[in-house]
Regions:
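Phosphate- and other anionic-substrate recognition elements at nucleic-acid/protein interfaces
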Residues: 2-152
């Protein structure tokens, strides 16, 4: 049975989202929570029912790291450290909200360790996925987590 695989890179402003239908990357976008919910309601559920496909989400587990962030430069200003910790906390809350959304729809969520794969390496991303459209670091990261779901 084929699946709809959703890759997610959680963020406080807009999540990187990648959708694989039947093993092929079809949607790559940045979306906020409401946009993602609309996509689930208007597309994923219908496609899942029409094709008898399961939906599975593969997400970067930002909750798996400590919010007490140590800067590379130990002499970094305390305000910089606090701002970084705040951003990590916001991303963690975003992940919690995403998981609640998927739980509401009874969609299976698989968490993956944080990875920088494909964030910077656009050429490798395009070679593996055959994606020719626009992408950014967050959407490529989401595509990577979705790709991990294809390989399971």
């Amino acid at each position: 049975m084929s699946k709809i695989i959703v890759g997610i890179d959680p963020d406080s402003k807009a999540h990187g989202v990648a959708i694989y239908y039947g093993g092929q990357l079809d949607i790559l976008s940045s979306m906020n929570l409401i946009e993602l919910q609309c996509l689930i309601d208007n597309d994923l559920i219908t496609t899942s029912i029409d094709n008898d496909w399961d939906i599975e989400v593969h997400i970067e587990d930002v909750n798996g790291v400590s919010a007490a962030f140590m800067a590379r430069d130990r002499k970094a200003n305390i305000n910089v450290k606090l701002k970084m910790s705040q951003h990590i906390g916001m991303c963690k809350q975003s992940q919690i909200e995403l998981e609640r959304l998927f739980e509401f729809y009874k969609i299976k969520v698989v968490k993956h360790k944080i990875s920088k794969m494909w964030k910077k390496d656009k050429a490798q991303f395009e070679k593996i996925t055959d994606w020719k459209g626009r992408s950014n670091e967050d959407t490529r990261s989401a595509a990577y987590f979705g790709y991990l779901g294809l390989k399971r």
